[in-house]
């Protein structure tokens, strides 16, 4: 299982660190209020080590930067989950997309994988769609294809298992010449071009996108409704 979690945070970030550390004031309040039963809900995670890496405010920008910062902590032969912080999946069946993807990667004898999120036809021309080969492994991402030309209904969910080679590519590749950003998809494409193979799994559950105000509000409203039920 996962024993170490690395959060890549901004230079002025404190919220994530505070959330995952013990809050003495909150603990004292719960005890005074007779709500000791709530203490386990705010306790730090057990049997796992939390690490924080700071992404400099100056320098490169893009999705490969935090992956490159974490590369030194990945040993040769190791793989690690990489999940972007502005999205998650909610599964009412209490299943785990992470566990499902790890099982798929292991079953295929590979060291890397990614999750595709099934989307409705109306959204296919608005997003990047994953193309796979006959074995269900990654070929490429086609940006905003026409519905009739889309190779699948799976969009990239930015949920990965990456090996040391891809971490190093994320650390060393230059910025994308068209967009000027350091993009993780460039590292993935370079790995494929070198003969690497990446499994593609299909995500289950509701996809919650929190990278925009409307998406963040929708995710919070969904959680409130679940609490009511």
Give residue ranges: language-model regions.
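A short, N-terminal amphipathic alpha-helix
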Residues: 1-7
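Catalytic-core segments of class I nucleotidyltransferases/pyrophosphorylases
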Residues: 81, 95, 99-106, 137-229
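A short, aromatic/hydrophobic, helix- or strand-capping loop or linear motif
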Residues: 30-33, 181-182
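Conserved beta-loop-beta/alpha segment of the NTase-like Rossmann-fold superfamily
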Residues: 16, 26-29, 36-132, 171
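Residues in the short beta-alpha loop(s) of Rossmann-like NAD(P)-binding domains
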Residues: 9-13
